[in-house]
């Protein structure tokens, strides 16, 4: 259980949050020990930890979920996860990935505007809670679900 959620940190601060990247439980523990209030598992860090190279296409959602779960369980500060384009090609798949990450303790999700991957139509704008297709629609579905049902003790993930 986190001392504070990302939502609380954002609401309580009048400054930008410093969110260092972590790649495993040891780096997460180091970030916590030196006093940071939050951390992020980035796609590049995940790829480096899992494959030894910084190439986003070499990791997958299963690896992200596995590493994020281990990190979230090993720390008392909230974890954000960069899921890039979500590794999925449909709104419902993105929705399910967001739900799975929330269930293992991820409290914030960073997602790219994936129009360069052919998921979002050109010119689509990703707005919290709205679906324009692809990632935006899947994440919008997730946010709407989270708002209606709540997401347990960590206040649901934020973007």
Model-based region annotation:
Residues 1-159:
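Alpha/beta enzyme core
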């Amino acid at each position: 259980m986190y001392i504070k959620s990302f939502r609380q940190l954002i609401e309580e601060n009048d400054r930008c949050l410093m969110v260092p990247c972590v790649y495993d439980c040891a780096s997460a523990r180091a970030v916590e020990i030196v006093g940071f209030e939050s951390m992020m598992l980035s796609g590049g860090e995940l790829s480096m930890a899992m494959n030894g190279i910084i190439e986003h296409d070499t990791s997958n959602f299963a690896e992200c979920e596995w590493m994020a779960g281990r990190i979230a369980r090993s720390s008392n500060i909230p974890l954000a996860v960069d899921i890039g384009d979500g590794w999925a090609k449909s709104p419902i798949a993105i929705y399910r990935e967001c739900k799975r990450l929330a269930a293992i303790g991820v409290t914030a999700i960073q997602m790219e505007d994936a129009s360069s991957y052919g998921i979002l139509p050109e010119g689509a704008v990703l707005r919290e809670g709205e679906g324009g297709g692809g990632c935006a629609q899947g994440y919008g579905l997730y946010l709407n679900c989270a708002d209606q049902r709540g997401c347990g003790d960590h206040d649901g993930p934020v973007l």
